[in-house]
Every structure is written in C-alpha cells, then in structure tokens.
C-alpha cells in the first residue's frame, strides 16, 4: 500500500509540475534570447511546439529585421539537403509567398531535420507597424508549406502547417528592440 501511495504521489507531483509549467509558458509564450551578435524574439508553434517564429536583429544594425521560421520534419529523405538556399512556396494566412531555406540541421541520427526558412530582411520600424496591423486583423499567423516546381511538400514534410498566436507581439518586440539599441549603445561607448 505504501508503494502505491508513493507511486500516486510521484505521478501527481509530475502532473502538477507539467501543468504549472504549461500555465507559465502560455502566459505570453514569447522568448527573448541573444548571443554575441544577434538578439532574437521567438514564439513556439501551436501545432508543433518546437517550430519557431523568429524575429532577429543584428546588434550592429537594429534597424534591420530578419523574419525567420522553422519546421521540423521526420519524413524528409536524405536528399532534403538539395533545398538549401532554394525558395519554397508557402502560404501565409492564405496569401501566396515563398521562403528561402537557409539551414537544414539533421537531428536524431538523421531521422529528422530542423529546416530554417527566411521570409526576408526588412526595415524594422516599417515592418513592425505592418505586422502590428496584420495582427489586429488576424487571430493567428499561419504558415503552410506548399507544392512547387519539382517540390512535393508531402514527400519532405509530415506536418506542413503551423500557426502562432501573436498576442503581445508589439510589447515584446518593443522590449527586444530596446535591448538591441541598448547593447549597440554600450558597444559604441
């Protein structure tokens, strides 16, 4: 009976830890990270949690914004590497675009791949205003990988769509931009 009680207690504790973590993570879901050269504002996906929407700025030029996203695939054959530096068709909230594959990282002994895409490089203030207007009109930011010339998306990706809620984007981006500018100012001093 004592073992059963310990077993139940441990499972209950684990359950509470998981629930508490999820509640904390779902509060706004944004993460600000940096390294020596860049600062990143990221948000995990709603469909595949590990997929990220990324806004990045170089400390040398905070007025230039890089908009990136990642998709994880466990379906891609070995020839997935052929798409590095190529543009792949996507839809972004039902509007047709393309995104450049800028990095493919094999993981799990080459049984899966992280694929990083670039949507582009933009003037920070203009792009953030544009995106803030977009957020007011749409509840979600949804990216769907699409078929293209010599590219069948289902051959390479098991899950072809993800979405992100961009609640509190403006506030979090303002904080990220401020930190970028502060570090740039400290570098110049």
Residue ranges: model-predicted function:
Residues 23-189:
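A generic "folded-domain core" signal
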Residues 1-25:
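Classical Sec-dependent N-terminal signal peptides that target proteins to the secretory pathway
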């Amino acid at each position: 009976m004592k073992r059963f009680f310990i077993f139940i207690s441990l499972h209950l504790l684990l359950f509470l830890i998981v629930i508490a973590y999820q509640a904390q993570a779902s509060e706004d879901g944004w993460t600000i990270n940096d390294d020596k050269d860049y600062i990143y504002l990221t948000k995990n996906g709603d469909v595949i949690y590990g997929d990220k929407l990324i806004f990045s700025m170089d400390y040398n030029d905070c007025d230039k914004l890089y908009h990136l996203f990642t998709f994880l695939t466990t379906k891609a054959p070995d020839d997935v590497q052929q798409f590095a530096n190529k543009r792949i068709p996507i839809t972004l909230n039902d509007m047709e675009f393309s995104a450049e594959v800028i990095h493919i990282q094999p993981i799990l002994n080459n049984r899966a791949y992280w694929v990083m895409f670039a949507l582009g490089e933009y003037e920070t203030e203009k792009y953030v205003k544009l995106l803030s207007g977009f957020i007011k009109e749409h509840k979600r930011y949804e990216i769907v990988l699409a078929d293209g010339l010599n590219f069948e998306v289902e051959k390479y990706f098991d899950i072809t769509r993800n979405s992100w809620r961009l609640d509190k984007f403006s506030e979090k981006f303002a904080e990220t931009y401020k930190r970028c500018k502060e570090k740039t100012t400290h570098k110049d001093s």
